[in-house]
Amino acid sequence: MNWFTKLLPKISTAKKKGVPEGVWHKCPSCTAVLYRVELERNLEVCPKCYYHIRLDPRKRLAQFLDEGEQEELAEDILPVDRLKFRDSKKYKDRLSAAQKATEEKEALVVYKGNIYGNPIVAAAFNFFFVGGSMGAAVGERFAAGVEAAISERLPFVCFSTSGGARMQEGLFSLFQMAKTSAVLARLAEYKLPYISVLTDPTMGGVSASLAMLGDVIIAEPNALIGFSGPRVIEQTIRQTLPEGFQRSEFLLEHGAIDMVVDRRELKSTIASLITKLTHQPPPDLPVEESV
C-alpha cells in the first residue's frame, strides 16, 4: 500500500447476499431458470418446453395418491450383497452411498393408498438409486405389492424408471424378470387391472419384463424406452437410427405402447381407466381435471 492509497477514504462494501439454495431450478432441456415453487405446482414439468423432470418415487406417489391415509408396503425388504461383488468399487459401498444420497433403502417404493377415493396399490422406481436398477430386493418389493393388491382385490399401478437389471447381483437380478412376470400373471388371473407407466428412462431388464406387461401401457412424453440404448444399437448394426427412435411418441406411433400422457393428466387418466376396467362409476374428478 503506497502513500496515495492511505489518503483515500475507505469505502465499505456491503456483502452480496446469496440466493437461498433450492429457490431456482434450471431446466435440463431448455436451460430456462425456473422458480422452484412454480415448478412444484406444475408437477415438475417445465412451463417453457414441457420437459418432464425426473422425480424421486415419494414425490411421484405424493402427486399421484390422495392426501391422507397411506401405507408403505415391503419397506423392510432390503438389498443384500450375496456375491460380495466388486468392480471399481464394492457393491456394499455403492449401496451405502446410494442410501445416503437418496435417503432410501432401495430403488423401489410401494404404497397402498387412494386415487379420488378409490383404493389402489402403487409402486414407483427411483432412478437416483443405482440407476433404478432391479435387484433381488426390488423384485421382492414389487412382488409384495402385487400380492397385496391380489389379497385385497385392488388395481396395481407401477411407475417405471430404470437402467435395467442390477449387474452387481448377477443371476439374482435376472431372476427378478421371471419373478415379476409370474406375479403379474397371478394378478391377471384374478382379473385385477395393472397399469404400467413408463417414465424417462425405462431400459434393460425392467423394460423387458414388468414395464411392458400392463393391461394398459402409458408413457410420459419424450421418455427413453427400450432394451439397449440407441448408441449401443447404432454401434452394433452400424446404421443411423430413425429420428426419435425409442422415444414415447415413436413407440406409440409403432404400436408398442397405448398412450402418451402429460404428467399433469396422469392421475385423472389412470383413475378413469381403472373405473372402466373394473366396471365402476366414473371417478369424481375436480372441475379443472374433468374439463
UniProtKB/Swiss-Prot annotation:
GO biological process, one term: malonyl-CoA biosynthetic process
Gene3D superfamilies given in the database record: 2-enoyl-CoA Hydratase, Chain A, domain 1
Keywords: ATP-binding, Cytoplasm, Fatty acid biosynthesis, Fatty acid metabolism, Lipid biosynthesis, Lipid metabolism, Metal-binding, Nucleotide-binding, Transferase, Zinc, Zinc-finger
Annotated compartments: Cytoplasm
Co-factor binding details: Binds 1 zinc ion per subunit.
Residues in C4-type zinc fingers: 27-49
Main location: cytoplasm
InterPro entries, alphabetized: AcCoA_carboxyl_beta (IPR034733), Acetyl_CoA_COase_Trfase_b_su (IPR000438), ClpP/crotonase-like_dom_sf (IPR029045), COA_CT_N (IPR011762), Znf-ACC (IPR041010)
EC number: 2.1.3.15
The protein's enzyme class: transferase
Any one GO molecular function term: carboxyl- or carbamoyltransferase activity
Binding site for Zn(2+): 27, 30, 46, 49
Record-level GO cellular component terms: acetate CoA-transferase complex
Catalyzed reactions: N(6)-carboxybiotinyl-L-lysyl-[protein] + acetyl-CoA = N(6)-biotinyl-L-lysyl-[protein] + malonyl-CoA
Pathway(s) annotated for this protein in UniProt: Lipid metabolism; malonyl-CoA biosynthesis; malonyl-CoA from acetyl-CoA: step 1/1
Superkingdom of origin: Bacteria
Pfam families: Carboxyl_trans, Zn_ribbon_ACC
Family as reported in the entry's similarity comment: Belongs to the AccD/PCCB family.
HAMAP family associated with the record: AcetylCoA_CT_beta
Role played: Component of the acetyl coenzyme A carboxylase (ACC) complex. Biotin carboxylase (BC) catalyzes the carboxylation of biotin on its carrier protein (BCCP) and then the CO(2) group is transferred by the transcarboxylase to acetyl-CoA to form malonyl-CoA.
Record note on quaternary structure: Acetyl-CoA carboxylase is a heterohexamer composed of biotin carboxyl carrier protein (AccB), biotin carboxylase (AccC) and two subunits each of ACCase subunit alpha (AccA) and ACCase subunit beta (AccD).
NCBIfam families, A to Z: accD
Record-given protein name: Acetyl-coenzyme A carboxylase carboxyl transferase subunit beta
Organism: Coxiella burnetii (strain Dugway 5J108-111)
